[in-house]
Amino acid sequence: MVKTILYKDTARWTLEKGFDALTEAVAVTLGPKGRNIVLEKKFGAPQIVNDGVTIAKEIELEDPAENTGISLLRQAASKTNDVAGDGTTTAIVLAHAMLKEGLRNVTAGADPLTVKRGIDKATEFVIEKIQEHARPIKDSRDIEQVATISAGNDPEVGRIVAEAMERVGKEGVISLEEGRSTTTELEVTEGMRFDRGYVSPYFVTDPERMEAVLEEPHILITDRKITMVQDLVPILEQIARTGKPLLIIADDIEKEALATLVVNHLRGVLRVAAVKAPGFGAQRKAVLEDIAALTGGQVISEDTGLKLENVRLEMLGKARRAIVTKDDTTIVAEGNEEAVKARIEQIRRQIQEVESSYDKEKLQQRLAKLAGGVAVIKVGAATETELKDRKLRLEDAINATKAAVEEGIVPGGGTTIAHIAPQLEEWAKSQMKDEELTGTMIVARALYAPLRRIADNAGANGAVIVERVRELPFDEGYDAVANKFVNMFEAGIVDPAKVTRSALQNAASIGGMVLTTEGVVVEKPDKQAKAPAGVGPGPGEGFDY
């Protein structure tokens, strides 16, 4: 493939064009009065979204060099989403502001590496200040506020997420399901999540979210290594006749057996997902017994003399739903309350009997997983388009509340970093000089960008709002809904410190990397012969089969 090489300023300006295109599309969604974006889908109805990372994933330009800029900025959003689960739009707005300011200086002759060093030092300073000002989560009211703000100022979402967290605990599992009515409901059921993901990505059923979702699956639980596919054939044939999917939890699955399962899954013969058993040694056996109690199945173990080839359908566990990602597996079960209660009592007795603090801790972890259950939020909406948007908002809200529990909360609406900016300027002028000072000031000026954008989206003058906020005490800021200045904690406008920190870290990382870029190598697009004017697709043409 023929390549195009761009150098120095041309390379940086081309990347910036991609940055501009993506930022303009994503930044309009920022804040409580942010607008929506409509995404055209090749198959199915268009999707209306308000979620930064979802929009970023969909944008692709014709120019491959500009597209490279989009991919780089998308990384800042994706990384923020992976770490904190929210704050993707803020990360994009910050990275764009740093890049615009930085490119101006580099073009004027500043040394990119020294400027980047200044950006890195400034980022460390701001992160320290964010952690200093973070307040721990006190009660469910704090959780409700965080969830409401994260869901785009939707109080109903805030209430449901806070109730879910109250019922399953701060470490509990909250799962989303598509409901069958127009109202969003909360249900707490038996269930468990463990930290083992699918052994092959070919088991994925939802490629957009990279999840394997199995509805009403049978569950094969074994502490044995599956080496020969012949061992599985009898039970696979029985399951195929039921038409239900299968989740395999095993010690390990050898290549030959795994390949057969993948091929059957891809051909649609049998929907299946396989994960490795959680825990180690004796601990693993106990966790498998917990899963068996939860799902009403048996552990197929050598200790009990059971062999895989002799397994019958009634020995398998059952669940309402199983969701498997690359990192963990969530089982939503129901109808085995008595067995689960008996198992919980057994673990409680063991906790009282053991003396080792390590064993006690592991037993308590198992108890929490079994007793906590799973909060299932059934998302309701009038149309499928609204349902998808609501699901994304709920997902953001759940992630934001978990981030808030971890690192605390800070004043929201871009206020925290806007208040830290003058402190950064003061510190930089006393500690930095020359081009390092330039790098630090780039970050200081970029810190106002999210607040400015929130105000602009609310129909106010962003520059005026920024100047007013600079004069206010740290806890006070701009309420875009009411268009007035308030105490952010009292008004319930709060952000998780982890989200703000991650957005800044990833924005600075991408911004700094682009500033130090001296060349871009991209594939030259093929200039394909265009059809003569007026010639449209004939019968059977122009469709993807």
Curated annotation (Swiss-Prot):
Sequence positions that bind ATP: T29, L30, G31, P32, D86, G87, T88, T89, T90, G413, D479, A480, V481, D495
Self-association state and partner proteins as the record states: Forms a cylinder of 14 subunits composed of two heptameric rings stacked back-to-back. Interacts with the co-chaperonin GroES.
GO terms, molecular function: ATP binding; ATP-dependent protein folding chaperone; isomerase activity; unfolded protein binding
Ranges in a coiled coil: none
Classification via InterPro entries: Chaperonin_Cpn60_CS, Cpn60/GroEL, Cpn60/GroEL/TCP-1, GroEL-like_apical_dom_sf, GROEL-like_equatorial_sf, TCP-1-like_intermed_sf
Species this chain originates from: Trichormus variabilis (strain ATCC 29413 / PCC 7937) (Anabaena variabilis)
PROSITE patterns attached to this UniProt entry: CHAPERONINS_CPN60
Name of this protein: Chaperonin GroEL 3
Top-level EC class as recorded in UniProt: isomerase
